[in-house]
UniProtKB/Swiss-Prot annotation:
UniProt cross-references to InterPro entries, sorted A to Z: Rpn/YhgA-like_nuclease (IPR051699), RpnA (IPR010106), Transposase_31 (IPR006842)
Protein keywords: DNA recombination, Endonuclease, Hydrolase, Magnesium, Nuclease
Protein name: Recombination-promoting nuclease RpnA
Keyword RNA-binding in record: no
NCBIfam families: PRK09857.1 (NF007361), T_den_put_tspse (TIGR01784)
Originating species: Escherichia coli (strain K12)
GO BP term, pick one: DNA recombination
Consequences of knocking out this gene: Cells grow to slightly higher density than wild-type in sublethal levels of streptomycin. A quadruple rpnA-rpnB-rpnC-rpnD deletion shows no change in basal RecA-independent recombination.
Cofactors, names only: Mg(2+)
Length: 292
């Protein structure tokens, strides 16, 4: 398929006809699936811009996009009429990309639900009949598996309803799942035993452990953070030293962050530099960085 299809005489003639409302109504009357056509209020037929389409996608298409309101209640149906003078094995996928872009554009306009976008392919190439499937799922190497995945709800990992005992069996994912399930609890002390058990399993590296406790400090119950990390450390002899080091470093980083925040406010308020240094304990270099 030519990269610049819209410059061909085939495309020019196609658009000359299909961008006329009366011609489009007749086209849709004959070619739009009857159950969908019955839902359309053809008096509301409106030619839509395709400026929302990515440049790389737009250059691959010669398309006309019409919208109509539905006969029953508020709602829109978009009719994507694509022109091809040569066959393309992946055209169904490309039309699906266009359809999804049209749906996103509809949401960006303020609507709260997805519209129906009906792709229709107008073809008059040399190969006859059209040699490829127009079901985008057939574009996959394993169409059967694609149907199983994309014709049903996507897999959901909802830790909010997952029993803790089940989470504890999830090896390297267990720490993440357990903490993010319970992070909004007012008191995390009830997780001390489980946390210590998971740390003792050796599934998390030092970087992950530091990130985990930093997350708890920032997002969880900061007031009892010291008690929490001390409790975990006492039950994890192997990690006790590193946990206490992490805890102290996080406390220092937290204090440093607070001091920098206060210093920035004081700088913006015009407080003399010497007074800020005395009040916050920050150096002149640290204050210079805070002012950036």
């Amino acid at each position: 398929m030519s990269k610049k299809q819209s410059s061909t005489p085939h495309d020019a003639l196609f658009k000359l006809f299909l961008r006329q409302p009366d011609t489009a109504r007749d086209f849709l009357a004959f070619h739009l699936p009857a159950p969908i056509h019955a839902l359309c209020d053809m008096k509301t037929l409106k030619l839509e811009s395709s400026s929302f389409i990515d440049d790389d996608l737009r250059e691959s298409y010669s398309d006309v996009l019409w919208s109509v309101k539905t006969e029953q209640g508020p709602g829109y149906i978009y009719c994507l009429i694509e022109h091809q003078s040569t066959s393309n094995k992946l055209i169904a996928f490309r039309m699906m990309r266009y359809a999804i872009a049209a749906m996103q554009n509809h949401l960006d306009a303020g609507y709260k639900t997805l519209p129906m976008v009906v792709p229709l392919l107008f073809y008059h190439g040399i190969e006859s009949p059209y040699p490829y499937s127009l079901c985008w799922l057939d574009c996959f190497a394993d169409p059967k598996l694609a149907r199983q995945l994309y014709a049903s709800a996507f897999p959901l990992i909802d830790v909010t309803v997952m029993p803790d005992d089940e989470i504890m069996q999830h090896r390297r994912m267990a720490l993440l799942e357990l903490i993010q399930k319970h992070i909004r609890q007012r008191d995390l002390m009830g997780l001390v035993e489980q946390m210590a058990c998971l740390l003792s399993s050796g599934y998390a590296n030092d970087r992950q452990i530091k990130g985990l406790f930093n997350y708890i400090l920032q997002t969880g119950d900061a007031v009892r953070f010291n008690d929490f990390i001390d409790g975990v450390a006492e039950r994890s002899p192997k990690h006790k030293e590193s946990l206490m080091t992490i805890a102290e470093r996080l406390r220092q980083e937290g204090e440093q962050s607070k001091a920098l925040h206060i210093a920035k406010i004081m700088l913006e308020s015009g407080v003399p530099l010497a007074d800020i240094m005395r009040f916050t304990g920050l150096s002149e270099e640290e204050l210079a960085a805070a002012s950036q």
